[in-house]
């Protein structure tokens, strides 16, 4: 499978995930633990790579990030400001 870059990044949601995580005062390890409780196997280092854009984000993870961070998928994708 070929993974493409968009403006040098492997995802567009990383900054929004970092913003939502920081607003809730969650560490990267806390977010990884919440994702694991929802059935996504992910570690703190993967969250770090995701936030800086060096990790591809599978589509099935987006609704789970939205759920645990209490935001919409549209917001994560930068389609809305709220």
Give each language-model segment a name:
Residues 35, 51, 61, 80:
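DNA major-groove recognition helix of helix-turn-helix
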Residues 17, 28, 44, 59-62:
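Helix-turn-helix DNA-binding elements, focusing on the entry/boundary residues of the two helices
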Residues 54, 58-75:
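DNA major-groove recognition helix of helix-turn-helix/homeodomain DNA-binding modules
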Residues 1-24:
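A short, Lys/Arg-rich alpha-helix, primarily the initiator
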Residues 25-49:
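Short alpha-helical DNA-recognition segment
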């Amino acid at each position: 499978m070929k993974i493409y870059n968009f403006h040098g990044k492997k995802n567009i949601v990383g900054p929004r995930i970092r913003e939502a995580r920081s607003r809730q005062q969650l560490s990267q390890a806390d977010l990884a633990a919440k994702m694991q409780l929802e059935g996504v196997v992910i570690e703190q280092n993967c969250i770090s790579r995701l936030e800086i854009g060096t990790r591809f984000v599978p589509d099935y993870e987006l609704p789970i990030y939205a759920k645990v961070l209490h935001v919409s998928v549209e917001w994560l994708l930068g389609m809305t400001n709220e």
